[in-house]
Regions:
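Sec-dependent N-terminal signal peptides
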Residues: 6-10
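C-terminal motif of bacterial Sec signal peptides marking the signal peptidase cleavage site
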Residues: 15-18
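A short, Gly/Thr-enriched small/hydrophobic beta-strand-prone motif that recurs across taxa
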Residues: 26-38
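Positively charged n-region of N-terminal signal peptides that target proteins for export
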Residues: 1-4
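Extracytoplasmic cysteine-anchoring/structural motifs
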Residues: 20-25, 75-162
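Extended low-complexity, serine/threonine- and proline-enriched intrinsically disordered segments
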Residues: 46-62
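Short beta-strand segments within Ig-like beta-sandwich modules, predominantly Fibronectin type-III
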Residues: 66-72
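Structural motif
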Residues: 36-46
Length: 162
């Protein structure tokens, strides 16, 4: 009988030690939309000019809040979305030349584990944009999560070197 009791306790200890309370939370809990800048003819990546700045406009309680969300000369940008159902970005090329990109999206709160912080995922439903300097914007992946993946291509008409 002592032998069975000993085996029972060993099994119980093994079972309970396998139930850890430490959750494996994702290292990145922020969902960012990734836009790649592309040549509309060749589909090659192009860099945004040095002076370009991208601002995000959020309407909250009837007030517009404007924040700079990107200001680097890169071939892509990763920017946050608003927790409202609409996000607007303005790309300022010069003092007077700019384009506006407006996203309409569903917000989906997500919790991977009770011990992990809540995250917000987004599903893009519609996109509108101006074409002052950019040619077009293509939706590549409507699901915006904490995973790093391309969601949009912004196409520009690039002057040829000929």
């Amino acid at each position: 009988m002592k032998k069975y009791l000993f085996i029972f306790y060993i099994g119980l200890i093994a079972l309970l030690s396998g139930c850890g309370s430490e959750a494996e939370c994702p290292l990145n809990s922020v969902s960012l939309a990734r836009f790649n800048f592309m040549d509309s003819k060749t589909h090659a990546g192009v860099k945004l000019t040095n002076g370009a700045t991208v601002t995000g406009i959020t309407i909250s309680d009837g007030k517009a809040e404007v924040d700079t969300v990107f200001n680097k000369a890169e071939s892509y940008m990763s920017v946050p979305l608003s927790y409202t159902d609409q996000t607007t970005y303005v790309i300022h090329y010069t003092e007077t030349m700019r384009d506006t990109i407006e996203l309409t999206h569903k917000n989906r709160p997500f919790v991977s584990d009770i011990e992990c912080p809540a995250m917000m995922f987004f599903e893009v439903e519609n996109i509108r944009y101006t074409t002052n300097a950019l040619d077009s914007v293509k939706l590549i992946n409507p699901e915006i999560t904490n995973e790093e993946k391309v969601n949009f291509h912004i196409y520009y008409r690039v002057a040829s070197a000929e």
